[in-house]
């Protein structure tokens, strides 16, 4: 099992304020174990052990006891969790377990050792707790599961891991719905408390993604789309930081860097960087950018990330950030690294690289390449590369974008492609592009209407010289509107 020594990482296992406050309250309410014994709800053995364990105040005393009675400790805690129904007592037990693990990470082994003796795994003891109603109980169980999974020598796998990751995704998606203004059922939990519980869930994810194997499982579970969904909606800076932290962790794996190319990560992070007022958010975005350029083993992948950053005006942001002073040396080092690498990429940037990067970012604008006759003459056929990858992006933008400038430029580019590539009409029709362009001929924006009309005429007409003369009368209006 591979674990990373993660530079500058905060301890994701630290509880949020609401969990810490509730845990302190729970610790103060001691349990009358004798009454449970008299009611025959627990065994004399478990009652005797838990009372002795509670009396051990110092970490050294606890450690000495656990070294000789680790198996009994795991057995007692699991018996108490499974035989007692009272919520307050279950909370107390989980808090004791969490405190014990936080005090010494190696103590997770007592649960794995006990489970192995019972020919079981540790997960079935804790995963059912995620279905309980009380939010503190649920989130304490989630924290314990993450610690066992991240700190233990045995990986969580198969249906157990899928179940846990699906639970995390559901909790994060509930935050996404709150951010979008959709009503979410939260019971008696206030909005502020709910937000802190979601931060606790994000902390569990941060802990899990420190382990390389879990990164692959998270991506396979469509976890990246979940993260991007949270980032694309309004969320507090702490959750924003935690989600970007998770992306940063994913980008430690070269294979993950390759896989993450298919998501629109760079534009989203560059937007957040532009608006960020928190140094910790700035720091983690720069660290993520650095990982994308540094951990990627394929030159093409590194170049694609660099071009996406250039397209999203990250160079300008870095130049502005360079003028500021930071307490954290990592920020200055990352800024220097990124400026150097992006500067090298700018030198190697061809017009086609520029066009490709702009198109993949989904943020089309009237940059010079779109109007360059030379560009289209030399590069129209290159839009067919990689099974028409760029053309598919172009037609998709015509379908999903609501930005008039993006639609106008996309329609224009479709027209230029069919004008310069002999079989372009057939390709565009097969991709559904012709109908998409025609749909915009009655768009409310004049620029979209004009460029859609022009593209449709290029799809229909064979005599380009005649078409050029026909459109001359409308062209001055367009130029004026564009300026």
From Swiss-Prot:
The gene is ATP6V1H. It holds the Pfam family V-ATPase_H_N. GO terms for biological process: endocytosis; endosomal lumen acidification; Golgi lumen acidification; intracellular pH reduction; lysosomal lumen acidification; proton transmembrane transport; regulation of macroautophagy; vacuolar acidification. It comes from Homo sapiens (Human). SUPFAM superfamilies: ARM repeat. CDD domains: VATPase_H (cd00256). GO terms for cellular component: clathrin-coated vesicle membrane; cytosol; endosome membrane; extracellular exosome; extrinsic component of synaptic vesicle membrane; Golgi membrane; lysosomal membrane; membrane. Coiled coil: none annotated. This is V-type proton ATPase subunit H. Signal peptide: none annotated. Keywords: Cytoplasmic vesicle, Host-virus interaction, Hydrogen ion transport, Ion transport, Membrane, Phosphoprotein, Transport.
């Amino acid at each position: 099992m591979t674990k990373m020594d993660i530079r500058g990482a905060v301890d994701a296992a630290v509880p949020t304020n609401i969990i810490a406050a509730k845990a302190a309250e729970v610790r103060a309410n001691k349990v009358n174990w004798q009454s449970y014994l008299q009611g025959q709800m627990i065994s004399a053995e478990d009652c005797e052990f838990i009372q002795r364990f509670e009396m051990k105040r110092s970490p050294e005393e606890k450690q000495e006891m656990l070294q000789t009675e680790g198996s009994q400790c795991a057995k007692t805690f699991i018996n108490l969790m499974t035989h007692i129904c009272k919520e307050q007592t279950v909370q107390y037990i989980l808090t004791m377990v969490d405190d014990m693990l936080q005090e010494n990470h190696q103590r997770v082994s007592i649960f794995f050792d006990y489970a192995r003796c019972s020919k079981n795994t540790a997960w079935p003891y804790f995963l059912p707790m995620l279905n309980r109603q009380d939010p503190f109980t649920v989130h304490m169980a989630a924290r314990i599961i993450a610690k066992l999974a991240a700190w233990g020598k045995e990986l969580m796998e198969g249906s157990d891991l899928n179940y846990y990751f699906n639970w995390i995704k559901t909790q994060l998606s509930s935050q996404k719905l709150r951010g979008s203004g959709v009503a979410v059922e939260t019971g008696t939990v206030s909005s502020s408390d709910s937000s802190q519980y979601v931060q606790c869930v994000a902390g569990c994810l941060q802990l899990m993604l420190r382990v390389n194997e879990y990164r692959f499982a998270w991506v396979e579970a469509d976890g990246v789309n979940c993260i991007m969904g949270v980032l694309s909606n309004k969320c507090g800076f702490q959750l924003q930081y935690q989600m970007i932290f998770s992306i940063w962790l994913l980008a430690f794996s070269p294979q993950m860097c390759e896989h993450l190319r298919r998501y629109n990560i760079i534009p989203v992070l560059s937007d957040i960087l532009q608006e960020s007022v928190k140094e910790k958010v700035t720091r983690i975005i720069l660290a993520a950018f650095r990982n994308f350029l540094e951990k990627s083993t394929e030159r093409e992948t590194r170049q694609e990330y660099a071009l996406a950053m250039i397209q999203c005006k990250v160079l300008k942001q870095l130049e502005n950030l360079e003028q500021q002073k930071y307490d954290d040396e990592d920020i200055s080092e990352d800024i220097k690294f990124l400026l150097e690498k992006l500067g090298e990429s700018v030198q190697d940037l061809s017009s086609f690289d520029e066009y490709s990067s702009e198109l993949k970012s989904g943020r089309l604008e009237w940059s010079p390449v779109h109007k360059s006759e030379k560009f289209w003459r030399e590069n129209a056929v290159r839009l067919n590369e990689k099974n028409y990858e760029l053309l598919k992006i172009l037609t998709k933008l015509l379908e999903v974008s609501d930005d008039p400038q993006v639609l106008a430029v996309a329609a224009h580019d479709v027209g230029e492609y069919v004008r310069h590539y002999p079989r372009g009409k057939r390709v565009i029709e097969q991709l559904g592009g012709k109908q998409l362009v025609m749909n915009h001929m009655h768009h409310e924006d004049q620029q979209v209407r004009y460029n859609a009309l022009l593209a449709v005429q290029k799809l229909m007409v064979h005599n380009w010289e005649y078409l050029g003369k026909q459109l001359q009368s409308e062209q001055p209006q367009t130029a004026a509107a564009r300026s």
